[in-house]
Amino acid sequence: MRIVITIGGSIIISEFSHEMFRAYADILNSLRDEHDLFVVVGGGRPARDYIGVARELGASEARCDDIGIDVTRLNARLLITALGDSAYPGVPENFREALEVAATGRIVVMGGTEPAHSTDAVGAILAETVEADLMINLTSVDGFYDRDPAKYPDARFYPEITASEMLEHLRGSDVRAGTYEFFDHTALHMIRRSGIRTMIVNGNDPENLLRALDGEIGTTVIPE
């Protein structure tokens, strides 16, 4: 199966530590013999910190996006290092390049691509480009909620939801660089257009990637 996996930066680099990179590398390496794997890595707190400084310096939102993209690519390089020879050694900067290097049979790891595209959007566009069978979005919560469960204990969890319903919930949310929450609008439009089977899963435990593949946890997004 061809799978695109997006790992939020808040998951993989919540602290400047090698441990999460190593743990995800071990899980991904255990899957590579059975699946074609593409991984998109987010920027996390380092990206937000750099973007915050850039805004204080008067940078435009487009420039802030560029800075965030640079950080995601650094995170991608760290994961590639953890994966060793099983990963393609370079970080593709666009979707065509990602598709081309997939011919090597190695795990393809990339960061951002262009301004105004979150990690979710990059993952969804990549999934369409490589004709993925599944996209798994690894985030800091158990799946999709109607509002932030960290702020609202009574937030409703959805084990299953359509992309159209998610768009209704997310209408009006913040789309500035470094502020994406829950799931990105562009990603949802891509999922709906391309019929990409998608799961949203808590990535704080790397083992949850295996549980998601077994259908045990997370939110399934129906592409309609």
UniProtKB/Swiss-Prot annotation:
An annotated Gene Ontology molecular function: UMP kinase activity
Subunit structure: Homohexamer.
Predominant cellular place of this UniProt entry's protein: cytoplasm
Description of how activity is regulated: Inhibited by UTP.
Catalyzed chemical reaction(s): UMP + ATP = UDP + ADP
Alphabetized UniProt keyword annotations: ATP-binding, Cytoplasm, Kinase, Nucleotide-binding, Pyrimidine biosynthesis, Transferase
Gene: pyrH
Residues reported in the UniProt entry to bind ATP: 9-10, 44, 48, 139, 145, 148
Subcellular location: Cytoplasm
Identification of the protein by name: Uridylate kinase
Keyword Metal-binding on entry: no
Protein residues bound to UMP: 43, 65, 113-119
Role according to the record: Catalyzes the reversible phosphorylation of UMP to UDP.
